UniProtKB/Swiss-Prot annotation:
It is found in: Cellular thylakoid membrane. It comes from Synechococcus sp. (strain RCC307). TPR repeats lie at residues 35-68, 72-105, 120-153. Essential for the assembly of the photosystem I (PSI) complex. May act as a chaperone-like factor to guide the assembly of the PSI subunits. The gene is ycf3. It comes from the Bacteria. One of its GO terms (cellular component) is plasma membrane-derived thylakoid membrane. One of its GO terms (biological process) is photosynthesis. It is a peripheral membrane protein. Belongs to the Ycf3 family. This is Photosystem I assembly protein Ycf3. The lineage of its organism: Bacteria, Bacillati, Cyanobacteriota, Cyanophyceae, Synechococcales.
């Protein structure tokens, strides 16, 4: 049974009903409707912590979806699942693919920065200063790009860039 038919949560049910209505009224082809249904089910599974099911749905949505922007959001959600599972390199690969399709996704840039910062902290704890510096530099680069796209967001990242001296002046304008 499709996930959309077995939701017990009121919010999930409401989202599913609204999504189904939108699918019925929007003039779109059957393949796009199927892709959205898989994407919707993937988001629902992800929200329930059912990551394997979420990935299956996202992979099917990605196979069906033709719109580059929509594909970018599918890849973004897949990356979130991989990151939640501690598969940081796989998450970074998905984020890179999402950016290749839509370079104006500050949330992707932010999440890539978070992963690199995390990996930098781990390297620092292990005494691997070169790797830590490399990861922190990557984090700074991704956060700087995210802040340029969304200047009012990522305040903690802005503070980190300032306190570590890794940010350039144009990021704070």
């Amino acid at each position: 049974m499709p996930r959309s038919q077995r939701n017990d949560n009121f919010i999930d049910k409401s989202f599913t009903v609204m999504a189904d209505l939108i699918l019925k009224v929007l003039p779109t082809n059957q393949k796009a409707k199927e892709a959205f249904a898989y994407y919707r089910d993937g988001m629902s599974a992800q929200g329930d912590g059912e990551y394997a099911e979420a990935l299956e749905n996202y992979q099917e949505a990605l196979r069906l979806e033709e719109d580059p922007n929509d594909r970018a959001f599918i890849l973004y959600n897949m990356a979130l699942v991989y990151a939640s599972n501690g598969e940081h390199n796989r998450a970074l690969e998905q984020y890179e693919q999402a950016l290749a399709l839509n370079a104006k996704m500050p949330q992707v840039l932010n999440n890539m920065a978070v992963i690199h910062h995390h990996l930098g902290s781990i390297a620092q704890e292990k005494g691997e200063s070169d790797e830590a510096d490399r990861r922190f530099d990557l984090a700074a680069d991704f956060w700087s790009k995210a802040i340029r796209l969304a200047p009012n967001n990522y305040i903690e990242a802005q503070n980190w860039l300032k306190t570590t001296g890794r940010g350039s002046a144009d990021v704070y304008l």
